[in-house]
Amino acid sequence: MPSPTPRFKIPESVLVVIHTPALEVLLIRRADPGEHWQSVTGSKDAPDEPLAQTAAREVLEETGVDCGVGSALAGALRPWGLINVYDIYPAWAHRYAPGVTRNTEHLFSLCVPAQVPVRLNPREHTAHRWLPHHAAADTCFSPSNAEAILLLPQFVP
């Protein structure tokens, strides 16, 4: 029996800045060693997966917050029409096919009620906190995540 073909991550992903109407931003700490605080991120599961579906799936998987079709928060997920293209961190390069060095990230935001319950997947994240958006931007390890958080006021109705 042949060995299964390794499944590599698709180098197209979403970044979802989850926030309250008062611009308190949810950050989650990665389970990797170090203090890697971030917003929700994740890659497409299939090349043809719609980006909004990727965003809703990742929000649910990483925080337990349901913003998928038919949920109470479905209309609160907003695509920004902005992308970041960045070099994949060397520590995570093995997750991608050989020769893949850059990722395209699509930005979204999700406005949630204050104190919405958060349920982390402990294999991926170990803690969460809500911070004012400037403090959240200062806390992120990723420059593109910090920049997105600073842009948040421009995308809040």
Describe the role of every protein-language-model region.
Residues P6-F8, V17, P98-V100, R119-N121:
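Short secondary-structure boundary/capping segments
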Residues T20-G68, L73-A74:
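Conserved Nudix-box catalytic region and its N-terminal flanking loop in Nudix hydrolases
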Residues P2-V25, P47:
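Conserved N-terminal beta-strand and adjoining loop/helix that marks the start
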Residues P11, S39, T101-E105:
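Short connector loops at helix/strand junctions that flank enzyme active sites
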Residues V17, V25-I28, H106-L110:
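Short, hydrophobic/aromatic-rich beta-strand segments within well-structured domains
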Residues E105-I149:
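NUDIX/MutT-family hydrolases
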Residues R78-P117:
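Active-site-adjacent beta-strand/loop module that shapes the phosphate/pyrophosphate-binding cleft
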Residues L151-F155:
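C-terminal alpha-helix
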